[in-house]
């Protein structure tokens, strides 16, 4: 049986709702939540199976999942979201908007 490489639309919707819920529970205000949603929509469309691929379909990076983290290996959306939030905290002082601004300028975060 072929391994799935994409989440369903329903799974993506559930992942997005879960991310918003986690961000809210962790004290991210509405603006910061919107920035995180914009960023992760751009990165993966909330697909927990997402990997960047070239035109032939081969992976072009080790980035994986909702937040497209380089060392992410968990297929669990909950863990991917929590790791993504932790990365925002470590790299951008907890500011999803700062991460989004960096992504706007550089094409990555």
Predicted regions mapped to residue ranges:
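N-terminal secretory targeting signals
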Residues: 1-11
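Peptidoglycan cell-wall recognition and remodeling modules
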Residues: 10-109
